[in-house]
Amino acid sequence: MSPALSPLLFINILLFLPFHHTASAAAPAIPVNGTCRNTCGTISVNFPFGTDFGCGHPDFSRYIKCSSGTLEFSTGTGIYTISSIDYPSSTITIADPFMSTCSSMQNSGSFRLDKASPFTITENNLFVLLGCSTTSPVFDQYVDLCDTGSGSRVCRGMYSCKGVTGIGLQQNAPATTCCVYESPTGLSSGYALDLPKLQCSSYTSIYDFGGNEGDPMKWKFGISLQYNDSYSTENCKNCEDSGGYCGFTGVDESFACICRNGLHTSNNCFGRGFAWSGTWRTKFQTRMSSAGFLLLWTMLFI
């Protein structure tokens, strides 16, 4: 190699190496999300829900996830098991492990829906407060918080259960400490059932009597929630038609179609072998690396 070219070679190498490093650093790892699935245990999981963060719609992912084969719903008052999802009616049913039923009653915690959540209580829910103090605000004669009509039959039915001994009452005790609660805030997002404030030992929720109003052992206990079903888009439909999962990515939580190989696209998975958010940079890096070696080889033999 000519001595006169040594400085030129040295300058070119110095100029090239930082550029090569920058190109390499700019290429992010291909985003892979292998956790999106269309089932969790025995429950089908469709949009807007997802099995993990990045799956489904971001407004729902902070409330619902799949954990060890169990689909869970989270609020500020706890984590609840989702027992069913009915997509045609846009409802989910959740089970509170501390909620009383006819067969088993116990002291319960409170229940609250987050105000910003896309969920509301369905109108067919009956919240029943059990073992309430005689000084409970639900018995305020100036505020109608208890259904004293058909609610009285529900209270008598609950107190006829053997499980009532779990909250310190005798079977068939007077239903004067029971209240079918009618929340003053209605059933919207932000619904709250604060048992300490209401001075009640336990609660239950009945979402279906199953045609057996006189037999509390056959009542369906749980909390039925209506969800906002207006999140579906044409992009999501195209994604699902191509076998992908609708999800989101990035700080702005923009739409992403997550293919079954774990890669993301901006629309669908037809013929997609690379992630739209990283492929071009990877190819660019490879080409620049090849060009750099060619430049170095040429200059060494000049």
Locations of the language-model features?
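Extracellular/lumenal glycoprotein segments
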Residues: 3-302
